[in-house]
Amino acid sequence: MVSIRNPPEWGIEPVPSKHRFLRGIDYFVLWSSLGVGLLVFSAGSFLTGARFEDAVLAIILGSVGGSFLLALAGKIGSDNAIPSIISTRPSFGIHGAYLPAILNVMQLVGWTTFEIMIMSKAAEMLLGKLIPYYIWTILIGTFVAMLGVAGPLTVIKNWLGKFAVWISYASSLIIIIHLATTGVFSKVLLSSGSGISFFSGLDIVIAMPISWIPLAADYNRFAKTSKTAFRGTFIGFTLTNILFYFGGLMLGVSDVVGIITAIQSIFFGFLLLILLVDEADNAFADVYSATVSTQTINRKIKQHYLIISFTILSIILSMSISIADYETFILLIGALFVPLFGVVLSDYYIVKHRRYTPSMLYGRDALKIGYPAIAAWSAGVLLYYLLSSLSPIYISSWPAIGATIPSFIISALLYIGMMKSKQRGYLLKKA
């Protein structure tokens, strides 16, 4: 029997084979759990502006396509037993990967703050402000830190697998069934939409699984086999993403506090309380991955020190920043990783043909700075911000085709083109 009581502290090094024992069902549990969240309800509500058939098609195709990319990113981790930011080194270089690491820490501290905010707000509303909001942030933050220190193996096997995910499934299904049988569904079904195109809807849906890509390998590196981890990741996230986007479509409330109020009215708030139990694992995943990303810059810092420090910072931020303002900020930072992983995935699966060696990741053959990757990434980021309505440089006169898919594709194609050109130049010189 494998012991998982004391999480090892190898940090960014390849995971030893004796600790790579998570199965496909474990990844189904993990990623289906991470697909559950109040934020997904919020995102789903934006689809009420589309025709019903367009919204449903966007939910299905966006969830399948986005989850496939998520599973591909996780497979780099399970193939090589490495965390996410290390997987950027063969394309961006050791020093070039520092910028993605810093940005990832920023966005993950942001998401941890956001999760603590909404869990604390929900708990405060549920108990009628019997316990002040700031006390809830401390209590919930402490619990998140405990999960982080316990580590992913313990959280997946003992917390999610044995307890949290199952009550989350039950409460989620009850909420969806309630929404579908109370007259809300018929209103959505008959809606003619208010101008959101299919492609804009697809962009809204695919953005959620893609937002988890910078974290995927941090957890999938513990897989016993890549094939089962890929299946568990893909199926698990696809199912819950479809379920919660459809729930958000029926709920029709985009404001997170409004969603909390709406769910609170179902079964006297009991289901909201259960849902909050599962929401904690999202915060755990954020704070743990922030720690691993930091260790790619300085591997000597102990994980538990970083986890506690990032959680304290998130608690302080959650007491001093409004939910609405902060959500837009972290969404804009998170958008940077869409074209970044367009580069990383194309490098691993197309340019390098799924062959990363330890020397490319850690040793003397590792790049210092990958200029083609940085150039392709920069072009993708610029395109994203030109196409995103959240961006200060958004061009409203351009066609509403969304920002996620175009920026991902353009960064991938540019990188592949530059690398193929570089390889041809090398061969010509050699000849």
Task: Identify the residue ranges that each predicted region occupies.
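Hydrophobic, membrane-embedded alpha-helices of multi-pass small-molecule transporters
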Residues: 24-40, 176-183, 190-251, 262-284, ...
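Transmembrane alpha-helical segments of multi-pass small-molecule transport proteins
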Residues: 100-105, 116, 127-152, 166-176, ...
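Membrane-interface loop-to-helix entry segments
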Residues: 120, 135-179, 192-193, 233-237, ...
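Extracellular loop-to-transmembrane helix junctions
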Residues: 45-75, 96-98, 238, 406
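C-terminal membrane-solvent junction of multi-pass transporters and transport-like membrane proteins
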Residues: 14, 343-417, 421-431
